[in-house]
Structures are given as C-alpha cells and as structure tokens.
Amino acid sequence: DESLNITAFFMKKGAGQLVDGTVYLDTNLDESLFLTPVDTTKRVSDYMIDLRSKEVRDVKILIPEKMEVSSLPAPYQIHTAWVDFCRTYSQTGNQIVMHKECVIHHRRVPRSEIPAWNKIISDWGAACNEQVVLKEK
C-alpha cells in the first residue's frame, strides 16, 4: 500500500449562509470523481467502478471568535461489499474537522444491484451535504 497525501489551503466563497445571527456551513466542498449514480435506463451489463481505492479527506474549519457551534451532523457510516463510507465531525477548541473516508473494495456492481448502489451513493451524498450550524455567542 502506498499513500499519497495532498494538503491544500483554500477559501471558498458561498460555503455558508448567515440568517438571523446563525451561520449554516456547507463543508462538503468537493465531489468524488468515482462515485456517481448509474443510469439504468439502457444499461445491459454490470457496472464497473473506475478503481479500487481508499480516499480520506479532512476539512478543517476555524470558528470565528464571536461564534460557537450550535450543531454538528451526527456520524454516518455504511459498510457494503463494494464500499465502506464513514463521515464524522469533531470539535477541538475553535476548530471543527469533517473527516470523510471512502474505501472501494470491489469494482463490479452487478446490473441487478445497481439500484441499491445508486441508493447508497445518494445517501452518502446527503450525509456529506449536511450542514454545520454556528450561532453568535
């Protein structure tokens, strides 16, 4: 097993909304290249995921001095023959970390199981898109 670690710092405009002193943050700032729903309308064969992989992403957010955490999304995980997904949030001091992990075990999704695959991908996307809520102190 070889690892590739990439660290990047960036700011993204529009990642949150301020409404009546409450900030709703979108922390899922990226899209997975390999995890998309499969169109089954004309498909006659099994689906092959591009590659086996383990993808780990940490998104760190600094909480502004005059704000505090109102709520963090509950942990999410699912384990299947194809993929393991895990997404957690943690807070230490004025920093929140969203930890996402995706491990692709088996690349082949049988045609008959593609609807189940699509549901797993949809649920994963919804879990990753849950918002962090901050409020004024």
Locations of the language-model features?
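A sensor for short, sequence-defined functional sites
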Residues: 1-137
